[in-house]
Amino acid sequence: NVASALLEQVKYGDQSRYLRKLSLSQIKKLKGKDMLAIYDKVRSVQCDLHYCGTLPVEKVIGTIRQHLPLERTTVASNSPYYRELKQYDRPTVFFIDMPDMAQSIVYGYVKGDPVDDKASRHASQLFSVYFGGDMSSLMFQEIREFRSFAYRTSGRYQLPNHAHKGTAGSFTAMLSTQSDKTLDALGVLDSLIREMPLKPERMEAVK
């Protein structure tokens, strides 16, 4: 949707998945031979194969070899792919003005510091659940349940895959609310971020 496309642009710039995928007009111009060439190129990239079933291993291997030329998978895979996060040196607000809409979808994004250790990874997971991960989180309870300032809330600190140690994570928060409640909801979110209340009983549940 529009809000998701804007968030991708803010976080990743030209690396936004909405900018990198082919447009409908470009797809219509593709020829059959172009698609086959792309498929052949994809088959040369190294991959992991998973099978769940009752067939003997030898039969599974034989079936795979019939359809995938494993001896030609010589191109190293860069999966999971890492996209560099954008850094902003001052608070910046991006708008998409849609006058006929009665609802606001607001995202907040902050690029974090590089993290390598396991303790920080576990801490980020705990924080995400505690702060905005589900219906018992701070965001949901304080913004939606107690004050009815939003329809939906979420807030998570996301770290890159283990394969990309030393790269930055990011904090992303989201509010979906009525236009006339937007500033009120943002005010509560700001207070939760700046002075996050500690609720010991909730921490035990998160663990």
Report the location of each language-model feature.
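Charge-rich, well-structured scaffold segments of protease-associated domains
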Residues: 1-78, 152-207
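His/Glu-based metal-binding/catalytic segments typifying zinc-dependent metallopeptidases
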Residues: 76-142, 174
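Short acidic/His-enriched helical or mixed secondary-structure segments at domain edges of catalytic enzymes
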Residues: 1-6, 84-103, 144-154, 199-207
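Hydrophobic alpha-helix feature that most strongly marks membrane-spanning transmembrane helices
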Residues: 131-135, 139, 144-152, 191-201
